From Swiss-Prot:
InterPro entries: PsdUridine_s_RsuA/RluB/E/F_cat (IPR042092), PsdUridine_synth_cat_dom_sf (IPR020103), PsdUridine_synth_RsuA/RluA (IPR006145), PsdUridine_synth_RsuA/RluB/E/F (IPR000748), PsdUridine_synth_RsuA/RluB_CS (IPR018496), RsuA_PseudoU_synthase (IPR050343), S4_RNA-bd (IPR002942), S4_RNA-bd_sf (IPR036986). The active site is at D106 (nucleophile). It catalyses: a uridine in RNA = a pseudouridine in RNA. SUPFAM superfamilies: Alpha-L RNA-binding motif, Pseudouridine synthase. Pfam families: PseudoU_synth_2 (PF00849), S4 (PF01479). Its EC number is 5.4.99.-. CDD domains: PseudoU_synth_RsuA_like, S4. One of its GO terms (molecular function) is RNA binding. This is Uncharacterized RNA pseudouridine synthase aq_1464. PROSITE patterns: PSI_RSU, S4. The keyword RNA-binding applies.
């Protein structure tokens, strides 16, 4: 196993957030192989080095790769919300490892969230270099005609730059509304809502159904499941990593 910075190791082992782990180190509460470390630059090999916090040994957590179907009206954050709104932590209480969401969905947006304690994979999923497509179902006000759909495919200038979907299609009409499937590989804030709103079609409901090769499928709202080895192999490959299946003991 490769060496990692001590603060990253402590964070991924579920001891504390990376920032709080740095505080523990600076306070002299962390030992590596029996010696107190106070430098944030120290690296450890989790398979060889013995790491302790306040005299208690710290063991690396097994890597977890989970997808959650986030319902509407949940904040994409761990811990309690200061204003009392529900957070996704309430939905993953039965996961013993400390996992974190990869990216976020707005409070009113539903659908696919990836959660993991694999920092390298998370960083690559979010990095624009890998251009992982995110697929959404958007229910918008009004009927989108073919002329407007063609204009949408050509893109439009928004306040933070030009935006053009990788793909967009009409799924069906629902009364006076239109259900669209729209794909972006960018991760700009409120991009889908702002893009469709620029064409005069306000988003009434938004749901993410895929991130790269990972699809939400029939997972019920508020439920989570582990990614299987086939899905993990595809996801790792999509971001330039090699997936090595965990050996069963």
């Amino acid at each position: 196993m490769m060496e990692v910075r001590i603060n990253k190791f402590l964070s991924e082992a579920g001891v504390a957030s990376r920032r709080k782990a740095e505080k523990l180190i600076l306070e002299g509460r962390v030992k590596v192989n029996g010696e107190v470390v106070r430098s944030l630059g120290v690296k450890v090999n989790p398979e060889v080095d013995i790491v302790e916090v306040d005299g208690k040994p710290v063991k690396p957590q097994r890597k977890r790769y989970i997808i959650l179907n986030k319902p509407c009206c949940y904040l994409t954050q761990l811990g309690r919300s200061p204003d009392g709104r529900k957070t996704i932590e309430e939905l993953i209480k039965d996961i013993p490892e400390r996992v974190f969401p990869v990216g976020r969905l707005d409070y009113n947006t539903e659908g696919l969230l990836i959660l993991t304690n694999d920092g390298e994979l998370a960083n690559r999923i979010l990095h624009p270099r890998y251009k992982l497509p995110k697929v959404y179902l958007a229910l918008v006000e009004g009927k989108v005609d073919q002329k407007t759909l063609k204009r949408m495919k050509q893109g439009i200038e928004l306040e933070d730059g030009f935006a053009k979907p990788d793909n967009i299609r009409i799924v069906r009409y629902e009364g006076k509304n239109t259900l669209l499937e729209i794909t972006f590989h960018e991760g700009r804030k409120h991009l889908v809502k702002r893009f469709l709103g620029a064409f005069g079609h306000k988003v009434k409901r938004l749901k993410r159904i895929a991130i790269g090769p990972i699809k939400l499928g029939k997972l019920s709202p508020g439920k989570w499941r582990e990614l299987n080895q086939g899905e993990l192999a595809q996801l790792f490959k999509a971001v330039g990593l090699k997936y090595v299946p965990r050996k069963r003991r």
